[in-house]
Amino acid sequence: MTVKMISCGLVASIISFSAAGDNVSFPARDMPAHDVVVCGGGPAGCAAAIAARRSGLDVLLIEAQSRLGGTATSGGVSHWLGGRNDEGEWVVGGVFRELSLRAEKECAAILPKLPAGKTYQPYAWLPWFIHGVVLDSDRIALTLDAVMEEAGVEVLLETRAVGVEKSGDIITHVITHSKDGFRRMPAKVVIDATGDADIALFADCPVLFGRDDDHLTTPASLTFHLSHVDGNALWDEIERSREPKFRPLIEELKKKGEWPFPYDIFISVKGLTDDEVMINTMRLTEIDGTSAESRTKGYMRGRREAYQLLDILRKYFPGFANSQMKSIAPMLGVRETRRIDGEFKLTVEDLRRGTEFPDTIGYSMYGWDLPDPKKPSVQPMVDETGGGFVNKAKKHLVTPIPYRVMVPRRCRNLLCPGRAISVERDVLGPLRVMAPCMAMGEACGIAARQIADGAANCDVDVSALLVELRRRGCIVDKAALPLVRPRVDPKASGEVHAHVRVHMD
């Protein structure tokens, strides 16, 4: 919501929130000004903060959880996806590559390789799937703490953005709330890395929610980790059966009435130790990730299902007979909520055509993974009846990310990296995961230099931005050559839809 500042003293202000026609006033502490305030300390926000600070800007990063890293740490999804191709080559460089290599050196991550003579490897759930970076969620949080301190980024944890103040189409302050009350954070540039377009919503930028017809979103998950798993027994069975999701076994259990869930897949990823496995099987339907009531239902249902799953795994699945619950994620894994409705929108048709964009700031190598809101085991853009993005080699396709997808309307100094970008909904599949979110965040952090110097977000000199991204090793040009191109309609023109002003030489 947009907040009205009523009065201002030397150290405190009175702010007024409008709700249901009533005004409610609260004292708010005035904070020192920053060039950039980044809202959200997940992958996009962390990369944005680092990049902006390295661009010489004074940066404040606020995060609602107790640690940085977002879904990778608090969400328990110990897997940075989408940043390497199926041969293990880098598709996303810059901060993502730097953090991955540093985490590997600090024993906080593993960069998987396909074992000789094998079709599957234990760090994934698809054949030849090695492009993820497997993490220790606790240690990677420690790595992120250190990186922020080294870069000189100011961090506030357990702090949530709850509103903004605007002057015309400029955000002047971000209003936050934490244990010590409300604060007014002055900023020249605001980066909305909340994943939910919270700041865009507060700033009255147009946003969309879920599917166009019913506004339902793809299912959420509550990830959990098991210990004391016989990994060899599990991976040997997957290699033998070629069924990493155990669909035939699940069908048998359904017939017996011993699989009580609406999803019929099993997803496991080996952890950093031989006996640890991340379980990302749950598909919690009808969860609104922007509603406290709905999220509460998701947590309660998720914790219940975690222990139901554990009992079934111990009884029927190879390798799990002696497994123990190690942890259940303290944060719900939400895949989709709001998206900004920008002047430019990346569409499925753009990608079918193989459209080349003059403002591509990075790529994703992840698949078209966006489960149906009502049929949680169905992937509309992957199944045969879907969007035609399946190829015979079953290799992943490169998806380009134009700068313009991060530019909202009605606000000149706001950028929105991450899953809340301006795209046709189905395009979220390859772009919502963590490595491409880091690519987007890094581009926003670098673009913030121009915006802090007076440029509007839609008037950023993209030529200069791309030069700097390449200088920092963020854009991996080799990634622009996908292993398999999408099917191209020969009647399509492949033109670039330049709805937002982009400066190009």
Segment roles from a protein language model:
Residues 10-12:
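Hydrophobic helical h-region of N-terminal Sec-dependent signal peptides
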Residues 36-38, 59, 414:
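Conserved hydrophobic helix-helix packing surfaces used for dimerization/oligomerization
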Residues 45:
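N-terminal Rossmann-fold NAD(P) dinucleotide-binding loop
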